[in-house]
From Swiss-Prot:
Name under which the protein is recorded: Small ribosomal subunit protein uS3c
Family: Belongs to the universal ribosomal protein uS3 family.
Miscellaneous: The large insertion sequence is present in the protein as found in ribosomes.
Principal localisation: plastid
GO biological process assignments: translation
NCBIfam families linked: rpsC_bact
Region entry S3-like 1st part, spans: 1-118
InterPro entries with a match to the protein in the record: KH_sf_prok-type (IPR009019), Ribosomal_S3_C_sf (IPR036419), Ribosomal_uS3_bac-typ (IPR005704), Ribosomal_uS3_C (IPR001351), Ribosomal_uS3_CS (IPR018280)
Keyword field contains Ribosomal protein: yes
GO molecular function: RNA binding; structural constituent of ribosome
Record keyword Coiled coil present: no
Length: 712
C-alpha cells in the first residue's frame, strides 16, 4: 500500500543502491538521534499509562463486587512528539478523554537505582573484556607478521646464494631449482615480457591506429597542396580552388632545338579586356568618393551659414517686418488659439480642458516639425546649387522655428498647471485621511493599554488562586514533577548514547563562543561600557554590568517604570532578553538537558470511538479474551458504519494476521465496508496497528478509517 518508509528516514524494499534516497538530511538536522529519542519517550509514556489502566481495571473489579458505580477508564488516543530544528526543545501532546486522571500516573513512578547501577557495571565489565580481547588479537597478529617476515628473509638469502629463485606475482610462491651434478643451471635467462591486460592492450592498439590514420591524412593534404588543388565546403556546395602559377602571358621568344619562334600565351585583345574593365571600376569608385566628400563639406558649410543667419535675426531687434515676414507665424497667433480653446471648453472641468489643450497643441507641433524639416531641406538644396542662402527664405524658416519653440513652452506650462492642481487635491485628501488615522491610532493605543492592564491583573489573580487552591497546586506540582522526570530520563539516554550528540555539543560550544564575542563587541551599546578603557578598572566594569542586568531582570508587573530607570531603552532590553535566552539554550545543549513542554488535549467520546487506535485496542482486548476473530471484526466494522450517519466515517477496513482461532498455519483475514482509497493522497485516513498476545502467538491488527477528502 504505497512506498514503505524506514523510521530513520530512508526507503525500504529497494535492492539497488543507486535508487535508495534519504528522505531527511541525516547529519545536518540530527534526524537519527531524534527518532531514537522519540521512540524511547513514547515507550516510557505508554508503559506509564498502561500501568494506570491496569490499576483502573483492578479498581473497577473491586467496585463490581461492592456494587458501586463503574468509573470510565481513561483512554489515550494519540501521543504526539513535536520538535524544532534544535534538539533543545521537545513538545509532547497527549490526546485522551480524561486528562485529569491521566496526570495521576506520575504518582506511580518508581525509579530503581540498583538496576541502573547493575547495568552500568555490566557495561563496564563487557567494555573491559572487549578491549582485552582486541589487544590480545592484535599481539597475535603482530607476532605472526614478524615470523613471516623472518622466514621470507631466510629464503631470500638462500636463493641469492644459489641463484635459482623465481618469484611469481599472482601465487606469491617461491620456487627453487635443484642443482644437477654440481653445476647450477638458471631456468630463466631471457627476460619475460610483461603480459598486458585486455583493456590496456586494446587502448594501445587504438592509439596506434589513430596515429597511422593522421599520418595518411597529412600526406594526402600535402600532395593536394603541392598540386595546387584545395577543396572548400559552403553548406551543401563543394568548391574546388585551383591555384596555378602565373605564366608570362605577353609574347615571348622560345627556342625549339635551334629555330627561334614567337609564342604568345593568348590573344592580346582578350588579355587587354579585363584590364580595361578594372580601370573603369577604379575610376567610378574614386569619383563616388570625391562626390561624397564634397557633399559632406557642403553640408557642414550650410549648417554653419544657417546658424550665423539665425543668430543675426535673434540678436537684431526687428522693428519693421523685413522681406519674407509671414502673419501665420506671429506670436499673437498662438495665444489666440489658446483663447479659442478656453472659450470652447469653459463648461468642462479644468483637468479635462487641460488635457484637450495639450492634445491639440501636440498635434500642431508634430505637423510644424515636419514642415520645418521640409523647409530646411529646400534651403540646403538651394545652397548646394547656388552656393549661398537667401535672407528672405532664411527669415521665414527662423520665424517658423521661433513659433514652434514658443508653442512647446506653452505646452509645458499647461502640463505643470494641471499637475499642480492634481497634487493640491491629492494633498488635501491625504491630510484628511491622516487626521482620521491619527484619531484611530490614538484610540487603538488606549484600548491596548487597557488590555495590557487587564492581562496583568488576570495573571496576578491566577497566581493568587493557585496559592489558595490546593488541587490546582497539586496539579502544578505534578506537572513539574513529570517534566523533571522526563528531563532526567532524556539526559540519561543522551549520556549513554553520547556518540549521537557529539556534533550538537560541538555546535553549542561554537555558538557560545560566538555569543561571547558579540557581547564584547557591542558592550558599549548593551551596558554603556568600553571594554578597552575598562581593562584598567575591572571592578567598575563588573558593577556597571551587574546594575544593568539587575535592572533588566526586574519584573515588569511590579515595576512599570523599569525601562526609564537607568536609561535602558526598549531596544536594549530586547537585545538582552535574546542574548540571555540563547545563552541558556546553548548551555542546556552542552549539558544535554532538553526543554520539555507537555500539553493535554481532551477528546470527546464520539470522536474517541471514531479513532483507529481505540478500535484496534478494543479488537486486541477481545482477541486476548479468546473470542472468535470473525465476530470481533464484523462487530467493530458494523459499529463504525452505524455511527457514520452521525459522524464523518465513510469507510472502514480491518485486517487480522496470525494464528487465527489457534490454527496451525498462520493466515490473514480482512473485512471492508464503504470506500477506503489507500492510493489517493488527498484521502484523510486514520491508521492504527496493534498486536494481540494470545496463547498461540502474536496476532497483528490493522485498522484503516476513511474520513473524507482533505483540501490541499
Amino acid at each position: 500500500m504505497g512506498q514503505k518508509v524506514h523510521p530513520l528516514g530512508f526507503r525500504v524494499g529497494i535492492t539497488k543502491k543507486h535508487q535508495s534516497q534519504w528522505f531527511a538530511r541525516f547529519q545536518k538536522y540530527a534526524y537519527s538521534q531524534s527518532v531514537f529519542e522519540d521512540h524511547m519517550l513514547r515507550t516510557t509514556l505508554v508503559n506509564l499509562f498502561s500501568n494506570l489502566e491496569k490499576e483502573s481495571a483492578l479498581a473497577t473489579k473491586q467496585s463490581k463486587n461492592r456494587g458501586a458505580t463503574q468509573p470510565k477508564a481513561p483512554k489515550i488516543t494519540q501521543i504526539k512528539i513535536e520538535r524544532g530544528l534544535i534538539p533543545y526543545e521537545i513538545g509532547i501532546q497527549i490526546h485522551s478523554n480524561d486528562c485529569l486522571s491521566i496526570t495521576k500516573a506520575i504518582d506511580n513512578i518508581k525509579v530503581s537505582k540498583d538496576l541502573v547501577t547493575n547495568l552500568q557495571k555490566t557495561r563496564k565489565y563487557l567494555f573491559k573484556a572487549g578491549t582485552q580481547l582486541k589487544n590480545a588479537s592484535m599481539q597475535v597478529s603482530d607476532n605472526l607478521n614478524v615470523a613471516e617476515g623472518e622466514n621470507s628473509t631466510m629464503l631470500k638469502t638462500k636463493t641469492s646464494a644459489s641463484g635459482t629463485s623465481v618469484l611469481k606475482k599472482r601465487t606469491f610462491k617461491i620456487q627453487t631449482q635443484k642443482p644437477t651434478k654440481g653445476k647450477f643451471v638458471f631456468k630463466g635467462k631471457r627476460k619475460q615480457k610483461k603480459k598486458l591486460s585486455k583493456a590496456v592492450f586494446m587502448r594501445l592498439k587504438n592509439i596506434k591506429r589513430r596515429f597511422k590514420k593522421r599520418q595518411t591524412i597529412k600526406k594526402r593534404y600535402l600532395n593536394i597542396i603541392s598540386k595546387g588543388l584545395l577543396i572548400r565546403k559552403k553548406g551543401n556546395l563543394i568548391i574546388r580552388n585551383v591555384k596555378i602559377k602565373r605564366k608570362n602571358k605577353t609574347a615571348r621568344l622560345t627556342s625549339r632545338k635551334s629555330q627561334p619562334t614567337l609564342r604568345s600565351g593568348s590573344n592580346l585583345r582578350d588579355n587587354l579586356a579585363p584590364v580595361k574593365s578594372k580601370m573603369q571600376r577604379f575610376n567610378n569608385r574614386m569619383s563616388k568618393k570625391f562626390a561624397n566628400l564634397f557633399l559632406t563639406k557642403l553640408n557642414k558649410q550650410f549648417l554653419v551659414r544657417l546658424k550665423a543667419i539665425m543668430k543675426f535675426w535673434h540678436n537684431q531687434n526687428v522693428t519693421k517686418a523685413p522681406l519674407g515676414y509671414n502673419k501665420k507665424w506671429s506670436l499673437a497667433k498662438s495665444y489666440a488659439l489658446i483663447n479659442n480653446l478656453k472659450a470652447k471648453y469653459l463648461a468642462k472641468d479644468i483637468l479635462s480642458l487641460g488635457s484637450l489643450r495639450v492634445q491639440k497643441l501636440r498635434k500642431l507641433i508634430s505637423i510644424l516639425e515636419k514642415k520645418s524639416l521640409v523647409k530646411m531641406e529646400t534651403l540646403r538644396k538651394d545652397f548646394i546649387t547656388f552656393g549661398t542662402l537667401s535672407k528672405t527664405r532664411a527669415f521665414g524658416y527662423y520665424q517658423m522655428i521661433t513659433f514652434l519653440k514658443q508653442l512647446k513652452e506653452l505646452v509645458t506650462k499647461i502640463k505643470k498647471q494641471t499637475i499642480a492642481n492634481v497634487t493640491t487635491k491629492q494633498e488635501l485628501c491625504c491630510y484628511n485621511k491622516l487626521a482620521l488615522n491619527k484619531t484611530k491610532i490614538q484610540n487603538l493605543i488606549r484600548a491596548k493599554s487597557k488590555q495590557t492592564k487587564s492581562i496583568t491583573q488576570k495573571v496576578v489573580n491566577n497566581f493568587v488562586k493557585l496559592v489558595d487552591d490546593n488541587q490546582a497546586m497539586a496539579n502544578e506540582s505534578r506537572k513539574i514533577k513529570w517534566i523533571s522526570y522526563l528531563k532526567d530520563l532524556v539526559n540519561k539516554h543522551r549520556t549513554e548514547n553520547i556518540f549521537y550528540y557529539l556534533a550538537t555539543i560541538a555546535t553549542a560550544r561554537k555558538d557560545l563562543n560566538a555569543l561571547k564575542r558579540y557581547t564584547k563587541q557591542h558592550a558599549n551599546f548593551l551596558f554603556g561600557v568600553n571594554v578597552e578603557n575598562a581593562k584598567e578598572n575591572p571592578n567598575a566594569l563588573l558593577q556597571r554590568v551587574t546594575k544593568t542586568l539587575t535592572q533588566y531582570s526586574k519584573n515588569p508587573l511590579v515595576n512599570n517604570d523599569f525601562e526609564n530607570a537607568e536609561g535602558l531603552t526598549k531596544l536594549q532590553t530586547a537585545f538582552l532578553t535574546q542574548i540571555e535566552s540563547q545563552r541558556k539554550m546553548y548551555k542546556a545543549n552542552l549539558a544535554l538537558t532538553p526543554k520539555i513542554s507537555i500539553k493535554f488535549f481532551s477528546v470527546k467520546t464520539t470522536n474517541l470511538l471514531e479513532k483507529a487506535s481505540t478500535v484496534a485496542d478494543s479488537i486486541v482486548d477481545a482477541l486476548e479474551k479468546r473470542k472468535a476473530f470473525r465476530g470481533v471484526i464484523k462487530k467493530a466494522k458494523e459499529d463504525l458504519m452505524l455511527r457514520s450517519r452521525v459522524t464523518r466515517v465513510k469507510g472502514v477496513k480491518i485486517q487480522v494476521a496470525g494464528r487465527l482461532n489457534g490454527a496451525e498455519i498462520a493466515r490473514s483475514e480482512w473485512v471492508r465496508a464503504g470506500r477506503v482509497p489507500l492510493q489517493t493522497l488527498r484521502a484523510n485516513i486514520d491508521y492504527a496497528y496493534r498486536t494481540a498476545n494470545t496463547i498461540y502467538g502474536i496476532i497483528g491488527v490493522k485498522v484503516w478509517i476513511f474520513k473524507g477528502y482533505s483540501k490541499i
